[in-house]
C-alpha cells in the first residue's frame, strides 16, 4: 500500500474497527467495573471469534503466548511488515520468532520486556529480539508502529 503524507496521517490517526471495539471494552471496564462482566457476556461472541479479538474476561487461557513467524507473515512475501499497534488492546505477554521494532510515533506506551517495565515516549524506538517475553499497553490516543522483521532477513 502506497500512501502520500496526508493519507498516512489520516490512516495513522483514524481508529480501526478493532481499535474501537477495544476502546469500548476498556472504557466499559474503567467506567463501570460493577457491570463489566455482564457487558462482556453480552458481546457478540461470533464477532470476537471471527476477528480473533482478545477479551481477557471471557478467556480462560493465555492469548497467543507464542507467535511463529509463519503465522504472522503467512500471506506476506516481504521480509519487513509495518503495522499500527492497536490502541486500547488488552495487554498480553507474548513472544515470537521474529524481530519487533516498536516505534512511538506520538504519545506514550507502557511496555514490559523480560519482566522490566519501561515507558516509551514520542520518538522512542525499542528493538525486541526473537524469543523475548514482552507486552505493550496504549490506553489513550497515542500511536505506535510495529515494524516486524523476519529472522531470516539477517
Say what each PLM segment does.
Residues 1-105:
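Generic protein-terminus/edge-of-domain signal
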Amino acid at each position: 500500500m502506497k500512501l502520500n503524507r496526508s493519507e498516512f496521517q489520516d490512516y495513522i490517526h483514524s481508529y480501526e474497527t478493532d481499535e474501537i471495539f477495544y476502546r469500548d471494552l476498556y472504557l466499559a471496564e474503567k467506567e463501570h467495573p460493577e457491570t463489566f462482566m455482564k457487558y462482556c457476556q453480552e458481546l457478540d461472541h461470533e464477532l470476537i471469534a471471527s476477528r480473533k479479538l482478545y477479551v481477557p474476561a471471557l478467556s480462560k487461557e493465555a492469548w497467543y503466548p507464542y507467535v511463529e513467524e509463519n503465522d504472522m507473515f503467512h500471506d506476506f512475501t516481504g521480509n519487513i511488515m509495518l503495522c499500527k499497534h492497536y490502541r486500547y488492546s488488552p495487554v498480553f505477554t507474548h513472544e515470537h520468532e521474529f524481530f519487533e521494532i516498536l516505534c512511538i510515533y506520538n504519545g506514550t506506551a507502557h511496555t514490559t520486556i523480560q519482566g522490566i517495565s519501561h515507558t516509551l515516549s514520542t520518538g522512542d524506538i525499542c528493538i525486541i529480539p526473537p524469543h523475548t517475553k514482552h507486552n505493550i499497553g496504549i490506553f489513550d490516543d497515542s500511536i505506535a508502529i510495529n515494524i516486524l522483521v523476519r529472522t531470516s532477513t539477517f
